[in-house]
């Protein structure tokens, strides 16, 4: 899966689960400050990413995720594992 494909899947997750306009979901966008996610949303996002990749995300790894670009990197790491 390419970075562009991952971004498109993430945009879809944000639109369907958090009612966020996909145009706002850019690699530079901050999850908490710009996209207004909270800690519960972050847990929901981690679950959706696990469903998308079929792999479990370690909570300590996901704690460092702050931007959409970080989410893309986390998905790439999961897919490479």
UniProtKB/Swiss-Prot annotation:
Annotated PROSITE patterns: CARRIER (PS50075)
Main localization of the protein described in the UniProt heading: cytoplasm
Source species, domain of life: Bacteria
The keyword Phosphoprotein appears for this protein: yes
Sample GO molecular function, one term: acyl carrier activity
Annotated Gene3D superfamilies: ACP-like
InterPro entries tied to this protein: ACP, ACP-like_sf, PP-bd_ACP
Gene Ontology CC: cytosol; membrane
Processing and modification events after translation: 4'-phosphopantetheine is transferred from CoA to a specific serine of apo-ACP by AcpS. This modification is essential for activity because fatty acids are bound in thioester linkage to the sulfhydryl of the prosthetic group.
Domain Carrier, chain residue ranges per copy: 1-79
Pfam families on file: PP-binding
Pathway(s): Lipid metabolism; fatty acid biosynthesis
Keywords, in A-Z order: Cytoplasm, Fatty acid biosynthesis, Fatty acid metabolism, Lipid biosynthesis, Lipid metabolism, Phosphopantetheine, Phosphoprotein, Plasmid
Record's subcellular location: Cytoplasm
Residues that bear O-(pantetheine 4'-phosphoryl)serine: 39
Single Gene Ontology BP annotation: lipid A biosynthetic process
Family in the record: Belongs to the acyl carrier protein (ACP) family.
NCBIfam families to which the protein is assigned, alphabetical: PRK05350.1
Biological function: Carrier of the growing fatty acid chain in fatty acid biosynthesis.
Name this polypeptide is given: Acyl carrier protein 2
Organism (species): Ralstonia nicotianae (strain ATCC BAA-1114 / GMI1000)
């Amino acid at each position: 899966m390419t970075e562009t494909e991952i971004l498109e899947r993430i945009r879809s997750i944000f639109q369907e689960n958090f009612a966020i306009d996909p145009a706002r979901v850019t690699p530079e966008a901050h999850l908490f400050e710009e996209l207004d996610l909270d800690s519960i949303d972050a847990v929901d996002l981690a679950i959706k990413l696990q469903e998308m990749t079929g792999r479990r995300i370690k909570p300590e790894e996901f704690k460092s995720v702050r931007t959409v670009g970080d989410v893309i990197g986390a998905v790439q790491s999961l897919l490479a594992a």
